[in-house]
From Swiss-Prot:
Glycans are attached at residues 21, 88, 297. This is Protein Wnt-4. Keywords: Developmental protein, Disulfide bond, Extracellular matrix, Glycoprotein, Lipoprotein, Secreted, Signal, Wnt signaling pathway. Its main location: secreted. It comes from Gallus gallus (Chicken). The gene is WNT4. Predominantly expressed in the diencephalon neuromere D2. One of its GO terms (molecular function) is cytokine activity. It is found in: Secreted, Extracellular space, Extracellular matrix. Transmembrane segments: none annotated.
Length: 351
């Protein structure tokens, strides 16, 4: 084999690996709906899936719209949590949807993997509970009386099914590679941390029964937390994420803190391998839109403040007129009427 042929072959392998980035399935969020998938051949046309995900799609046609909703949930929550950060989870119309930000082993990639695996688990579980799927329903293992004195009843969220489907669908690329590279280990860890954010925050919801509103006895069921709660938990984990490196315990490859003085991470924590860029400058090649034109808070000293958000470049101040509702009065029955009030406010945007 000639050196030139070897190099060309190696380049093709690298490009193929990149094109099959493990988060490419998030492109499903760009589709208006995949609920119309009724034939296996349609799965082949879904952009962003690797072959094993295509096979899962063919075996689980009815679940794919839940996967799409999970991807949308993940992107929307990411954009909410990072709305005041330099990197605000902006998406592109290409693969991967977050650009090369998620192909690097950064904190941001850790959060994306965690929130997206949680999104699929959440959306599939919700579809089970609402009766949308034939393959699953409510969690029937939660039955009978409880030590607290209430009766398990109602429709408990079948989180076990949602988590299992998320593991099978989202983790498939890393699993197919044998999960031996440090990046595969990082992705798998953060995927599981995302699902743990749901599992560890399951709630007990109850309904009282009795005469005249009394609570003679209660029936209760287990419910997932709101997805905003999941996002809040993972955002805290992002802020406290642990930088790790690969090590070996016997023949097993594991991730350990890069700084031995730091306490070991748990299954619930996010981990990362590489330092993040500053996200200040426009770099579309890497999916970084920069902060020029972003609104900032003139009085804040935090990351949303103009000094930090604008990376020291300064900012523009414009006055704009906004119309708000004021002098609202309740009219019997049953409406609220308000007057329009005009107010001039200052808007600060990064140079």
């Amino acid at each position: 084999m000639s050196p030139e042929y070897f190099l060309r072959s190696l380049l093709l392998i690298i490009l193929a690996t990149f094109s099959a980035n493990a988060s490419n399935w998030l492109y499903l969020a760009k589709l208006s709906s995949v609920g119309s998938i009724s034939e296996e051949e349609t799965c082949e046309k879904l952009k962003g899936l690797i072959q094993r995900q295509v096979q899962m799609c063919k075996r689980n046609l009815e679940v794919m719209d839940s996967v799409r909703r999970g991807a949308q949930l993940a992107i929307e929550e990411c954009q909410y949590q990072f709305r005041n950060r330099r990197w605000n989870c902006s998406t592109l119309d290409t693969l991967p949807v977050f650009g090369k930000v998620v192909t690097q082993g950064t904190r941001e990639a850790a959060f994306v993997y965690a929130i997206s695996s949680a999104g699929v688990a959440f959306a599939v579980t919700r579809a089970c509970s609402s009766g949308e799927l034939d393959k699953c329903g409510c969690d029937r293992t939660v039955q009978g009386g409880s030590p607290q004195g209430f009766q398990w009843s109602g429709c408990s969220d079948n989180i076990a099914y949602g988590v299992a489907f998320s593991q099978s669908f989202v983790d498939v690329r890393e699993r197919s590679k044998g999960a031996s590279s440090n990046r595969a280990l990082m992705n798998l860890h953060n995927n599981e941390a995302g699902r743990k954010a749901i599992l560890n925050n399951m709630r007990v919801e109850c309904k009282c029964h009795g005469v005249s509103g009394s609570c003679e006895f209660k029936t209760c069921w287990k419910a997932m937390p709101p997805f905003r709660k999941v996002g809040n938990v993972l955002k805290e984990k992002f802020d406290g994420a642990t930088e790790v490196e690969q090590s070996e315990i016997g023949s097993t490859k594991v991730l350990v803190p890069k700084n031995s003085q730091f306490k070991p991470h748990t299954d619930e924590d996010l981990v990362y391998l590489d330092s993040s860029p500053d996200f200040c400058d426009h770099d579309l090649k890497n999916g970084v839109l920069g902060t020029s034109g972003r609104q900032c808070n003139k009085t804040s000293k935090a990351i949303d403040g103009c000094e930090l958000m604008c990376c020291g470049r300064g900012f523009h101040t414009d006055e704009v007129e906004v119309v708000e509702r004021c002098s609202c009065k309740f009219h019997w029955c049953c409406s609220v009427k308000c007057k329009p009030c005009h107010r001039v406010v200052e808007i600060h945007t990064c140079r």
